[in-house]
Amino acid sequence: MFSRDLTIAKYDADLFAAMEQEALRQEEHIELIASENYTSPAVMEAQGSVLTNKYAEGYPGKRYYGGCEYVDVVEQLAIDRAKELFGADYANVQPHAGSQANSAVYLALLQGGDTILGMSLAHGGHLTHGASVSSSGKLYNAVQYGIDGNGMIDYDEVERLAVEHKPKMIVAGFSAYSQILDFPRFRAIADKVGAYLFVDMAHVAGLVAAGVYPNPVPFADVVTTTTHKTLRGPRGGLILARANADIEKKLNSAVFPGSQGGPLEHVIAAKAICFKEALQPEFKTYQQQVVKNAKAMAGVFIERGFDVVSGGTENHLFLLSLIKQDISGKDADAALGRAFITVNKNSVPNDPRSPFVTSGLRFGTPAVTTRGFKETECKELAGWICDILADLNNEAVIDAVREKVKAICAKLPVYGA
C-alpha cells in the first residue's frame, strides 16, 4: 500500500532538487521560446492523477480492457470539447505529441513513396513536413516550397510545384512563419491537383481557438495540432477533421493500433481541462494580447535597425535575422541566456551558417503574456535584448539586464500565491 505522505521531496531528494531548480528558473527567467508556455495548476494536477494507472487501448465504448467506464467519460469530454472549440466534426485526442499526430495522418492517407508538398524547414516549416532528416522525408517523396524575397509564402510557387509534381498531399503549417496562412488558396491548389490538404496548426491553435487567426478546419481535409504552445495545455497532440466517415476511420486506425498502443489518459484529462479553459472568454483576451505583444516587440527590433523576417508579425512569433550584424544565433542565444532571457537560435532564409549555429533568433510571446506582460513590458524587454545584441560580449550590460529581468519576473510571477 502506498502512503500519500510519500512525496518526491521525501523519497528522492536528488530529483526533487532538480525539479525545484527548474521551478525557480521558470519564475526568474523570461521565456521567449515560441513553442513554450506555462500550464495551469489544474492541467498539472490532471497529469499527476490516478488516471496514469489505467491502460485503455481502443476508443471510448470500444476498449480492449475492462474497467474503462470512467476513462471513457474523461476521453469523451476531451473529444467533445475539442470539437466545440475548433468547430470540427471529428477529434482524436490520443496522439502523444504533434509529431505523432502528423505521422498518423501520413499513415492514414498515404502510401510509402507518395509525394507530399510541404514548407521547407529552412524557410520556416517543420521537420515533419518533409525534411530530409525526418521520417516524413524518408518514407515519402517530399517536395518543398518556401518564402519569397519579402519573407512571404510564394503561393504561385506552391501552385507551380503542385502542378509539376502532383502531390498526394499538400501540407500547410510552420514552426517559424509570422504571417497569416491563406487557407482558401491552399484549398484551391489542392483541389486543382486532386491532393489532400493537411494543415498543421500546432503553433497557432490557441489563436485559432480564440478567433484571432483563421480557422483551417473548414478548408482542410485534416488538421493537427499540439496542445501546448499557444493552446497552453499539456504536451500532446490532437487530430481534427470535418465529417468524412472514410477519413475518420483511417485516422482512428492510424493512431491505434497503427502507431500507438494505450493512450495516456492522464494527459487526455489535462487536454480536457485545457480545452475547457480555451472555451472561456478570458482566453480570447489572452490570445489578443499575445499578438499585440509580438507586434510590439517586433516593432522595437525594426526601430533599432534589426531585420525581422517578413517585416513584422501577424501572430505570436517572429524571426530575427542577424546576418547583417554578423552575429550567430548560437552566440546571441548564449548571451541572452546569461541575462536570464530564454530564446532559441533559428535558421533564417539564405542563412550562411549551419542549423546548429544559425544566423537568427526566434521569439514568441505566449509565455510572457501568460505571466502578465503587456505591450509596455514587451517593448522594454525588446530594448534590453537590443542592448545585448549591440555589444554581445559586454558582461556589464548582460549583468544589468539580468537584474532588470529578475525584478520584472518578481513583479509578474508565473504562479501566484
Curated annotation (Swiss-Prot):
Its cofactor is pyridoxal 5'-phosphate. It comes from the Bacteria. (6S)-5,6,7,8-tetrahydrofolate binds at residues 121, 125-127, 354-356. Pathway: One-carbon metabolism; tetrahydrofolate interconversion; Amino-acid biosynthesis; glycine biosynthesis; glycine from L-serine: step 1/1. One of its GO terms (cellular component) is cytosol. PROSITE patterns: SHMT (PS00096). It is an enzyme of class 2 (transferase). The modification N6-(pyridoxal phosphate)lysine is found at residue 229. It is found in: Cytoplasm. The record marks 228 as: Plays an important role in substrate specificity. Disulfide bonds: none annotated. Gene3D superfamilies: Aspartate Aminotransferase, domain 1 (3.90.1150.10), Type I PLP-dependent aspartate aminotransferase-like (Major domain) (3.40.640.10). It catalyses: (6R)-5,10-methylene-5,6,7,8-tetrahydrofolate + glycine + H2O = (6S)-5,6,7,8-tetrahydrofolate + L-serine. Its EC number is 2.1.2.1. Keywords: Amino-acid biosynthesis, Cytoplasm, One-carbon metabolism, Pyridoxal phosphate, Transferase. GO terms for molecular function: glycine hydroxymethyltransferase activity; pyridoxal phosphate binding. Pfam families: SHMT. One of its GO terms (biological process) is tetrahydrofolate interconversion. Catalyzes the reversible interconversion of serine and glycine with tetrahydrofolate (THF) serving as the one-carbon carrier. This reaction serves as the major source of one-carbon groups required for the biosynthesis of purines, thymidylate, methionine, and other important biomolecules. Also exhibits THF-independent aldolase activity toward beta-hydroxyamino acids, producing glycine and aldehydes, via a retro-aldol mechanism. Belongs to the SHMT family. Homodimer. This is Serine hydroxymethyltransferase 2. It comes from Pseudomonas syringae pv. tomato (strain ATCC BAA-871 / DC3000). The lineage of its organism: Bacteria, Pseudomonadati, Pseudomonadota, Gammaproteobacteria, Pseudomonadales. The gene is glyA2.
